[in-house]
Amino acid sequence: MGYKCTRCKQKVEIDYEYTGIRCPYCGHRILVKERPTTIKRIKAE
């Protein structure tokens, strides 16, 4: 699952074995999870 940096807008892969979560490009700590591009269809009853 990919994340996106809120400062530089780069796609970031998270290494969960490393203790700190930061953008490797700019060092910013706020990352948002990218949403999937597919649309989920649910049938209404």
UniProtKB/Swiss-Prot annotation:
The protein's Enzyme Commission number: 2.7.7.6
Reaction(s) catalysed by this chain's protein: RNA(n) + a ribonucleoside 5'-triphosphate = RNA(n+1) + diphosphate
Signal peptide segment: none
Cofactor(s), by name: Zn(2+)
Positions bound to Zn(2+): 8, 23, 26
UniProt-annotated location(s): Cytoplasm
Cofactor binding, note field: Binds 1 zinc ion.
One Gene Ontology cellular component annotation held by this UniProt entry: cytoplasm
Cytoplasm among keywords: yes
Coiled-coil region(s): none
Keywords: Cytoplasm, DNA-directed RNA polymerase, Metal-binding, Nucleotidyltransferase, Transcription, Transferase, Zinc
GO MF annotations in UniProt: DNA binding; DNA-directed RNA polymerase activity; zinc ion binding
Keyword Transferase attached: yes
Family: Belongs to the archaeal Rpo12/eukaryotic RPC10 RNA polymerase subunit family.
Subunit structure as annotated in this protein's UniProt entry: Part of the RNA polymerase complex.
Known role: DNA-dependent RNA polymerase (RNAP) catalyzes the transcription of DNA into RNA using the four ribonucleoside triphosphates as substrates.
Full protein name: DNA-directed RNA polymerase subunit Rpo12
